[in-house]
Amino acid sequence: MAMGKYSRVDGKKSSGYGLTITIVLIVSLCLVGAWMFMSSWSAPTESIDFSANERTKDVDTTKSDFKSEEVDRGSKSFPDEKNEETEVVTETNEEKTDPEKSGEENSGEKTESAEERKEFDDKNGDGDRKNGDGEKDTESESDETKQKEKTQLEESSEENKSEDSNGTEENAGESEENTEKKSEENAGETEESTEKSKDVFPAGDQAEITKESSTGSGAWSTQLVESQNEKKAQVSSIKWKVCNVTAGPDYIPCLDNWQAIRKLHSTKHYEHRERHCPEESPRCLVSLPEGYKRSIKWPKSREKIWYTNIPHTKLAEVKGHQNWVKMSGEYLTFPGGGTQFKNGALHYIDFLQESYPDIAWGNRTRVILDVGCGVASFGGYLFDRDVLALSFAPKDEHEAQVQFALERGIPAMSNVMGTKRLPFPGSVFDLIHCARCRVPWHIEGGKLLLELNRALRPGGFFVWSATPVYRKTEEDVGIWKAMSKLTKAMCWELMTIKKDELNEVGAAIYQKPMSNKCYNERSQNEPPLCKDSDDQNAAWNVPLEACIHKVTEDSSKRGAVWPESWPERVETVPQWLDSQEGVYGKPAQEDFTADHERWKTIVSKSYLNGMGIDWSYVRNVMDMRAVYGGFAAALKDLKLWVMNVVPIDSPDTLPIIYERGLFGIYHDWCESFSTYPRTYDLLHADHLFSSLKKRCNLVGVMAEVDRILRPQGTFIVRDDMETIGEIEKMVKSMKWNVRMTHSKDGEGLLSVQKSWWRPTEAETIQSAIA
């Protein structure tokens, strides 16, 4: 536009004057050109396109990170924690001073003209067209494809750099070191070509990427820098603090709500041991016990655990003579005894089998409930008989007893038979066991025993090993008479009473009826039959009622027929699913089979071999949204157990899980789970969080995930990509190690490992101050 103005003036001036102006302009342009050339030659690294180079660095970094994760996952050592902001600065500095990259770029610039540097190499033979200004008009189709595939890499390059404490660190307070050197160490390595790597991290053509046109970013920001800054802002907006609570490292939010407990009018029915969740889920992280170490592997953990992990000795002092637990140097040891089996649980287990062979451990009897479990040695040794025992006891009835059980690798939970139903469906347990469980079954119309009747499968057994069975004191005789009257009115048949001479105890074995004949022939309707409108499967926060649910006699419905023997039962499609529609829209039986095959494939081809999980450390597993229990079924041959959780707003598939010989529980993930901190080695969530975020605060849910997962434990999430992104930001803010990300068709997979990191600041939870 300026030259156009001068041309209009030229017609009014003399030719000599115009020549002078022309010479001045030419000289000026030459000087400017020389200055630009000298600047470019003297500092070649400054002319490198930061944006293009950043993208190249991103892809290289992600490739090397992915190779490290996929090939070297067996290593037990993981990168230390690293501050995210420092990470970005380091990356930028490395790019600007990388001699290899600088050399390649500079040599290319010296041999090409300015016009040639703006062109894109015709690597694929398609050619590039330019418009009148010399700019590229269209890119090759192959490069457009690479740019789309590269989007995931550019967004996750920073996040794929590990931010975890050392994987071999055993104590929480150790110093953290910066070990992030993956990109430099792996630069130039050849990517292994596998189907998974193509789906997750497409390789791209590095040579082609580095020859892209170098258009200086100047004062303009790049999308990569903007995205990195936004991610840092979002992550830093979550400022984690340690929970300052009376329970310290043993904090269970819904069981340590002292504000609610102090307001109770009565504790006669153990109301103070029931769940009282705070109005808002805590968003702080529970502290670690001083000297906490990684849990001992199963099966050694059944015999001993680290004292520093659960530094409680009261139970050893009170119950040591009954071989519950003893102190032994740096360990707490468990001789395998109990109040009713001082000489070992296995002898007691075999005694029960001999007393009534129809029990058939691990065949007919697969899933049992152990009430008032002590330290759960009974359930721990039933694994040797292929039996799953879910043990429960009130929190702190005996100091840390449930916590001991879980640390040993034995299924257990904090719960109480108080005023509400147990969080299980009706008619699911093959056997229920009570060994000196201190529950007054006979009082208040037998309300508590009737709750067991609800949970017990028709034809199932109730094993009562308590002093009224074999002692003749006045109190014991009175309880026995009351119990006999109640069980007869409930139509339970006393199958046998046997005495264990070695342990000097006895057991009475009852069986629940498989028909309603006895109920209909009773002379008195006491206890009364439940109303037809009373759903025996309704269990979440439902008050107890002293009534009997009729058993199902229709063979096409659940409960009328005993399940297949174990292990066939885990793969057998329940007959009663025939007339129902499945969760995924197909006929239920077809749905069940497809789900079973799907999880077998996922577990065998991905989880067991492709994620770098050391399964020898995995004992306590939770499926946070279980559906049919396919995930747990696929893991049945491993030496572990799975707590299957069916959220209260999901289809009620928990009875199907029990039918398969597995167990589980109902739960609302907007509240804390009734377990101690650091009790699970692996948490699995399949499309849980996308539904939770509609009604829960995900920060509170993730604080709960952190609470129940052990340091160095694994967290696997499958969900839509938006939700995966949110979860990834949160785990990164807690310094967890992102081990793997995968995306396809809008769905994502995230695998992370919890670190040892704890915040330095504290947050007082007023409801948890005693």
UniProtKB/Swiss-Prot annotation:
Top-level taxon: Eukaryota
Region Disordered, residue ranges: 54-223
Record membrane topology: Single-pass type II membrane protein
GO cellular component: endosome; Golgi apparatus; Golgi medial cisterna; Golgi membrane; nucleus; trans-Golgi network
Side of membrane Lumenal, spans: 39-770
Membrane-spanning residues: 18-38
Family named by the database record: Belongs to the methyltransferase superfamily.
GO MF term set: methyltransferase activity
Biased composition (Polar residues): 212-223
Regions of this protein lying in the Cytoplasmic compartment: 1-17
Designated name of the protein: Probable methyltransferase PMT24
Alphabetical list of Gene3D superfamilies matching this protein: Vaccinia Virus protein VP39
Subcellular compartments: Golgi apparatus membrane
InterPro entries in the cross-refs: Put_SAM_MeTrfase (IPR004159), SAM-dependent_MTases_sf (IPR029063)
Top class in the EC scheme: transferase
